[in-house]
Amino acid sequence: MAEFPASLLILNGKSTDNLPLREAIMLLREEGMTIHVRVTWEKGDAVRFVEEARKLGVATVIAGGGDGTINEVSTALIQCEGDDIPALGILPLGTANDFATSVGIPEALDKALKLAIAGNAIAIDMAQVNKQTCFINMATGGFGTRITTETPEKLKAALGGVSYIIHGLMRMDTLQPDRCEIRGENFHWQGDALVIGIGNGRQAGGGQQLCPNALINDGLLQLRIFTGDEIIPTLVSTLKSDEDNPNIIEGASSWFDIQAPHEITFNLDGEPLSGQNFHIEILPAALRCRLPPDCPLLR
């Protein structure tokens, strides 16, 4: 095997007992690859490990976990200054793995690990909310956010992405739309939103294609709003084709401003952020990510 620069894997603490992962790492090490492994225990560990990765001079920092882990590692990488910033590698080990799935990361651990180490590094966008919090995949608001943040961990562990749908059906009687106003470049909408998706990536909530036209290197955010007064009829209508769906509002812009008369919550790659005012903007070519050559989210 050709020689590859060293990499550092930042592994979510929930995946430490993953025997196939241990075996995959050992095999690659036996083939001559240098792979450092660090395990997260609490919030902020990823920043510290990225700093260590730079001191070690690795070419890639691999995020081993779900969308939240990818978010934390990618956010730490874009905060780095200077040259020779490591590329991001992705090893999907979470419940839903929405970003990894949509960009075409292999499900097989050994193949995903090889791609994370040796794949082509391509500049991709990220998004930033209120000049502080970032997301690499999607910001979701409304019905979808409450479901993904409230779904019990045991249900997610047992059923994966399907758990979000099941929990949503159980909660329909208590969920109401969010009234808000959204502005962007050549875009303005005001009304009641059941679901809001602002995507750099395409899917969230365990495989739901909220922003099917999103690309991760076009300098734009894709917006999709699901409107309606009643949740069940709206969800039924969303199963139809987009052309027949009167409850979908779409837009594209490098930024969006959201204002609400009451507190609403957005889910940023799994992390909730509540408030009444949100400014969401794209950060073009914010970091390099090792992706498959046929990644469908590249223009």
From Swiss-Prot:
Residue positions of the active site: E271 (proton acceptor)
SMART domains: DAGKc (SM00046)
Subcellular location: Cytoplasm
EC number, UniProt record: 2.7.1.-
Cofactor note: Binds 1 Mg(2+) ion per subunit. Ca(2+) may be able to substitute.
Domain (DAGKc) ranges: 2-133
Superkingdom, natural source: Bacteria
GO cellular component terms, A-Z: cytoplasm; plasma membrane
Keyword annotations: ATP-binding, Cytoplasm, Kinase, Lipid biosynthesis, Lipid metabolism, Magnesium, Metal-binding, Nucleotide-binding, Phospholipid biosynthesis, Phospholipid metabolism, Transferase
GO biological process per UniProt: phospholipid biosynthetic process
Pfam family membership, one: DAGK_cat
Molecular function GO terms recorded: ATP binding; lipid kinase activity; magnesium ion binding
Amino-acid positions noted as binding Mg(2+) in the UniProt annotation, renumbered to this chain: L215, D218, L220
Major location category of this protein: cytoplasm
Binding residues for ATP: T40, G66, D67, G68, T69, I70, N71, E72, T95
InterPro entries per UniProt: ATP-NAD_kinase_N, Diacylglycerol/lipid_kinase, Diacylglycerol_kinase_cat_dom, Lip_kinase_YegS, Lipid_Phosphate_FormReg, NAD/diacylglycerol_kinase_sf, YegS/DAGK_C
Protein family: Belongs to the diacylglycerol/lipid kinase family. YegS lipid kinase subfamily.
Entry function: Probably phosphorylates lipids; the in vivo substrate is unknown.
HAMAP family reported for this sequence: YegS (MF_01377)
Protein name per UniProt: Probable lipid kinase YegS
Source organism of this protein record: Escherichia coli O127:H6 (strain E2348/69 / EPEC)
